[in-house]
Amino acid sequence: MTAVRGRRGVRSVAAAGLACGVLLGATASPARAQPTDEHHDQMTGPAPELLVRAFGSVDWGATELPGVSNSFALGQFDLFITGSLNDRVGVLAEIVMESSGDNTRVVTDLERLQLTFRVNDHLQLAAGRYHTGIGFYNAAFHHGAYFETPIGRPRVFSFEDEGGVLPIHEVGVSARGTVPKTESALHYVAEVGNGRTWVTDESAEGRDQNGSKSTNVGLSFAPERWRGVEIGASFYRDTILDAASSDVRHRIAAAYVVYRTPSAEVMAEWLGLSHQTADGRLFRNHAGYAQVSRAWGLVRPYYRLDRLAVSPSTPFIGDRGSYQAHIVGLRVDPAMWIGLKAEYERTDEAGHHGINAVRTQLVFVF
């Protein structure tokens, strides 16, 4: 069983919507189309203002893995768009374009699209496609590689179409804010979504495959007097259909401790993943990372320990295997919105032990 690409449904729905729009526009008579144009012309008030940022990267890597040659590659080209409809309602969209394989074909994915209504500091409601609030990393770092210190995400937070084991993206609704009477130190998040699709089912593409919705709740503590410190935990649950249409109970517990300032970074995160099949078999796996960095002027050395331990018999993710890596690198920021990273990685995973690799990445924002 293999995971279905997490973005496939979004592309299909977008394509269907575009096709319907073209057909309706082509078949509408002038008499029916005119009122729509007039209504558009009669819109009053200032048009919403959009802020657009673009993120890009150019990568190079070489590894001791047999049959893999050193190569340059384009990273994700990320368009990040935000806008305010009024002082309480905002919109966020993130569109990523990336090359597919060794050819020049470009794949476009709608990674995030959210409409957020801010009631007050204690309650913000959002609907759309979002990054799930599992742990810290997935909510703090999105598709702009510029903001990440090392090259790439920890293995457990890999994106779905890169073999990730987590539901990184979901479509649904969420609520977040600060807990009253905690001096804004205690934050919460609650999410309800469709969950991740793991088994191919063309008839259910773009929809939840069963009636069970995923839920995720989290709490984090970030006291003002300890600037940069954040301690938190989250719990995710869903029921997934396997190839035999049997329910598999999926649970993800996460806990983290983070200290981040412009000059220093210490991050540690642990996740426990469990899958329980309909016949009562329980599979427990875990993953995590520890990361430190320190900036001296334009130069920032860093280290990351990255680990993913998965039993081969686990439903859906057993073929990912176990992985551990030690990563040592250096980041230099020669100018504002430009960064250059270089790192050495030593990896142990199924069938390949003590593999050495070097990578570089140029990141930029405009």
Residue ranges and their predicted role:
Residues 64-67, 105, 114-118, 126-129, ...:
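Outer-membrane beta-barrel pore domains
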Residues 204-212, 248-250:
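Interfacial loop-to-helix transition and helix-capping segments at the boundaries
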